[in-house]
Amino acid sequence: MSQFPSSAIFTVSRLNQTVRQLLEMEMGQIWLSGEISNLSQPSSGHWYFTLKDERAQVRCAMFRTSNRRVTFRPQNGQQVLIRATITLYEPRGDYQLLAESMQPAGDGLLQQQFEQLKQKLAAEGLFDQQFKQVLPSPAKQVGVITSASGAALHDILQVLQRRDPSLPVIVYPTSVQGADAPLQIVRAIELANQREECDVLIVGRGGGSLEDLWSFNDERVARAIFASRIPIVSAVGHETDVTIADFVGDLRAPTPSAAAELVSRNQLELLRQIQSQRQRLEMAMDYYLAQRNREFTRLHHRLQQQHPQLRLARQQAQLVKLRQRLDDAMQQQLRQTLRRSERLQQRLMQQQPQTRIHRAQQRLQQLSYQMQSAVERQLNQNKQKLGIACSRLEGVSPLATLARGYNVTTAPDGKVLKNVTQITPGETLKTRLQDGWVESQVTTLVPNPSSVKKRRKPSSQS
């Protein structure tokens, strides 16, 4: 078996480290476009995702310090363009990219620019409803700003011819796609305002991709539409297409054909309206005549009611009613006076001195009885409390202890004696018994042997 020099043998760690250094030094930073998949955004703030195309994929990471500068929220399936460094994660030997910047690619970039311009113009108030102009009804002359060769112009003219052939139309031809298109659209709007030939404008084109419709997302076009003194109907693309011009315009039409219907009158509808107005006029006339007939009948009846004989009869009936009301009022007043007199008499009877004295005597007797009962209850409670206190006092009295055969001996200075060490032979002591005092003189002291042993100290060893 042949021997290899030790320097030619790699460990796994050394191999991964060498490959990482080669990738980072040789490749450096690169730009890479692809579709995002497996996007993960954990609580750490870092992003982990895969970039793929139809044939391959590569793992990517974007740390929090880098992704905080990204101006949009990435989504799975979104095409993006990233600037990244190629590296290798040594512990697992995984090859990956460390992204430092990210931006949308293709339509994604256009969509981001669309949202940014939309927010800017909305903040300036260009979309506010208060600035929207009302379309004339009916329009006297319509202006169309679109491509002269596009299908949108053909659709608009066809609808106008069908609905209102007598409506004049002025076309302001312009490019609707390409780098020069926004400026041409702006000039066409300004020209229409200078000539003042039309009282409403249709600005639009047929359908297409987001990039095809981009001229109508241009800020210059938006500001020209906002500044127009002539009301503008925005008609760009299909119903699902939305542009900045739709937000700024005075009215949005889903298609160019729909815009033509909005600014024109339908002849058949006009005929139906005329017929309807005629029917309403006839009905109004019939109603008016019927009202006048009813008014005549009412006045004739009132004239008959104003005959002098009828008026006299009504006044006599009214006089009878008034007389009856007067009698009723006098009877009511008399009854009220009688009831008031009875109430005053009852109150006078209640206020007589004898009645008040009798009630006061009854109240005094009741209070006297209550006071006597309260005093007796209080005396009984105090007697019970005194008896309990005396019993407790006798239980702790020294005299009670003496009655059981005990006595208390005191020294000449009055101090109570507890042991023989406090006594000196020859002293005169006082002993308190239950029924008196005894004075005695000490001749002999006889200590308790057990107490002497307790007080004796142990002898030291020689």
From Swiss-Prot:
Reactions mediated catalytically: Exonucleolytic cleavage in either 5'- to 3'- or 3'- to 5'-direction to yield nucleoside 5'-phosphates
Claim: Cytoplasm is one of the keywords in the record: yes
Principal place of residence: cytoplasm
GO biological process terms, semicolon-separated: DNA catabolic process
Molecular functions (GO terms): exodeoxyribonuclease VII activity; nucleic acid binding
Gene Ontology cellular component annotations, sorted alphabetically: cytoplasm; exodeoxyribonuclease VII complex
EC numbers on record: 3.1.11.6
CDD domains xrefs: ExoVII_LU_OBF
Superkingdom per UniProt: Bacteria
Pfam families attached to this UniProt entry: Exonuc_VII_L, tRNA_anti_2
Keyword presence, Acetylation: no
InterPro entries hit by this protein: Exonuc_VII_L, Exonuc_VII_lsu_C, OB-fold_nuc-bd_dom
Keywords assigned: Cytoplasm, Exonuclease, Hydrolase, Nuclease
HAMAP family the UniProt entry points to: Exonuc_7_L (MF_00378)
Assembly and oligomerization: Heterooligomer composed of large and small subunits.
Similarity section: Belongs to the XseA family.
Role description: Bidirectionally degrades single-stranded DNA into large acid-insoluble oligonucleotides, which are then degraded further into small acid-soluble oligonucleotides.
Name assigned to this protein: Exodeoxyribonuclease 7 large subunit
Provenance organism: Pectobacterium carotovorum subsp. carotovorum (strain PC1)
